Structure formats: C-alpha cells, structure tokens
C-alpha cells in the first residue's frame, strides 16, 4: 500500500536517505523537475531506481511544453506554448491540429521511454482578458470548441503511450490575475462565471485524475481555497459533475497555501482530497505529513489507486521519432509561425 503523497527529490539521483524512506513509506508518486534531469540515460536509471524501491510508486512530471518545460536544454522538447496553437487554429485549423498532435506524440514518446507514468496535463482553465499570463499561455484559449478539439488530441496521445493525464486546475484558474505560486488568489466572480469555468472539466470528466486550484472562490466558499473546500470537491466535483477519478492537490508549498502541516492535512481530509502534492523535497516535513495522515485516518479512507500503467500498443523502438521532429519543424518553417 502506498502513502497518499506525491513528493519530490533534491538531485538527479537518489540520496541514501531518499532511498531508505522511499522503500519504507512508498509514496504514491514522485514528481520530477529540471534539477532531476541531466540526460535521457540518467532519467531512465533514476526512474528504474525508484521502481526497484517501490514498484507501485508512480513517476510524475509537469511537462506541458512551452513555458512549463522540465527539459529546457533538450532540443527534443522545444515547442510553442498552448495558447500559440490556439492563435494558429484561428487562421489554420488543420495546421494547429497537426502541430498539437506532433508535439503530443513526441512528448509522450519520450516520457514513456523514460519510465514516466503521469504527466500533469491538460490545463483546462478558461482564460479571459484578466487571466494571469502564466496561466493564459498554458491554455488552448477561451473558445470552448477549439479548446476541446486541441485538448482531446493531447489527451488521446497520452493514453496511446500509456502516460496518464491529470486535468487542472479545478475548478478553474481563469478568473484571476494572480499566480497561486506566489500569493493566494481570491475571486468574487459570479456563479455564472464560475460555472463557465467548469465547462471543460465537464467535457473531460472521465479522465482518471484531477488537480485542484489553490484559489478562494468567494461565491462558492468564502473560507477555503478550492483544495480545502468540501463544497467544491464533494458537492460540485463529486456530486454535480459525478467525477469518479482521483483528486490530488496542487503543491502545498505554494504561497497560496498558508496553512501549517497539521492544518493542511486536516483540511485535506475533510475536503475530500485523495492525494496531496508536496514539492519541498524535505523528508523532515514528509515524515511530519505522514504522521498527520495517521492521526486523521487519511491512510484508511483516501488511498484509492485508480490507475495502473497500460502497456503502450506501440513498440517504441520501431518509431522513427526524428521523422516527427522534422515534420513539426518543417511545418513551423513553411508557415512562418
């Protein structure tokens, strides 16, 4: 049985302490950042090492492409932001679909070959004129039809290669000009505007995993951010949208979460979270979190594992990935975009 936490590690290899604790506590997931990545062989060795210590621990990454890129120095991962594809779609719909397909195919090919199980995409926030740039650039735009078409291409590619998608940031990060990494966004948006933010989550409600937003939605819960809101996670997500998958938090070390560890775990338990994400890489902190899990019975009633990695139907070694890279680059050059 795994512990209901997704953790991070400090370097591009496991320290003795990390090896020991991963083996003992078996975290639900370990999320990789740029600091954990040097080259492809090193990543394969790292993911293999993690699996040897805890077979059921899933390897996560946030590899959206564009401004969120954990492979920044790798030529294989140089892609446009999602919002750029929305702009391209307005002029060349077929081209935009082809480019998103190629980007997704290439990304998932590498993630699968590196032993990565989960990618925290798609971003389903619906932007408007006030949306903070850090979020807007990561979306496929405000047109629901276009967004749905491009998101579906991205999601299907993930499943094709056995990489689980995680939709985010529920119930929507599009109504604020604040970045929850640095402060706690609070929105007074109307119920109508809030329901509009749910549109894409309804469309993709059958995806196996969802990440919450560290935002306070005054008209739904004027006390808690969505991550800690029973009304948002139980009444809206579970009852209204009938979501059956796994619910994980955004990173608890983000500035939008100003609660103590004890309070965070208590609120997470009451809100209906299944898994928490903590990217501190701090094992003293992780041990404290795990101790608080036991106090709140988080272990007993939250540890649902709803996903087991499917073996890809494709034989990775038979794919000429350079062909897909060349086609992507040729199309970009041909259309001058």
Regions found by a protein language model. Give the residues of each.
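N-terminal small/glycine-rich loop or linker at the start of catalytic domains
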Residues: 1-4, 64-89, 126-134, 165-187, ...
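N-terminal hydrophobic targeting/anchoring segments and the immediately downstream early-domain regions
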Residues: 1-78, 332, 337
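Glycine-rich tight-turn/loop motif centered on a GG-T
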Residues: 35, 77-97, 131-150, 178-195, ...
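Extended, intrinsically disordered, low-complexity segments
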Residues: 295-337
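Second-shell residues forming the walls of enzyme active-site clefts
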Residues: 7, 35-51, 152-159, 163-292, ...
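Glycine-rich, aromatic-flanked loop segments that form ligand/cofactor-binding clefts
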Residues: 54-80, 100-126, 147, 151, ...
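Short, acidic/polar
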Residues: 9-24, 99-110, 194-200, 260-267
